[in-house]
Amino acid sequence: MDSREPPSLTFASVLEQLWSQLADGQRLRHSAFHQAVLATSSPRGPSARYVVLRQVDRERGVLGFHTDRRSEKWAELERDPRVSLCFFGQSVQVRAEGRAVLHHDDAVADLAWKRTGLISRRCYLAEAAPGTAAPIPTSGLPAHLSKDRPNEAESAGGRVNFAVVTVPLQRMEWLHLAFEGHRRARFSRVGFGPWRGEWLVP
């Protein structure tokens, strides 16, 4: 299905395009869907930031990303697991909502850590928590890692800070922008049941 122009649409064709773009986002770093804006709730109000899409499970309807468990994001999710993820690319916006499930000291996080490359593991070796005030611009990394990737043994120190967030989706909205007129659909489900669609005015 070409996302640049809406052909004869069905709920099935929209879901197929939607999950295909999400799958590309996980696999391809240059895909527009490789990153999403994650919205959470903080004591100050709404909080949003980009995350990298690391997991797409179409069969179960689950998305996932990695984070540092010392981050404000993690604390916000512990207080309120409700999240919204927003993707945009090729004239298509996808909003996905669910309740985050946090993984740190479990098999899900262990497996994700094993699959994470050394250069990505380096992010979790920062000596202070993300968001900590600093007197100068800094990466927070140990000096010897500022221009190099850690070896396997060095990277192991980041495991304690590494965490996985999975989001079993309960609701998705698809919006296609087109000169001929935009198109919009909403999909919802109960638990891990089937998706039910409805058309919306854009």
Residue ranges of predicted features:
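Binding-site signature for planar aromatic cofactors or substrates
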Residues: 1-202
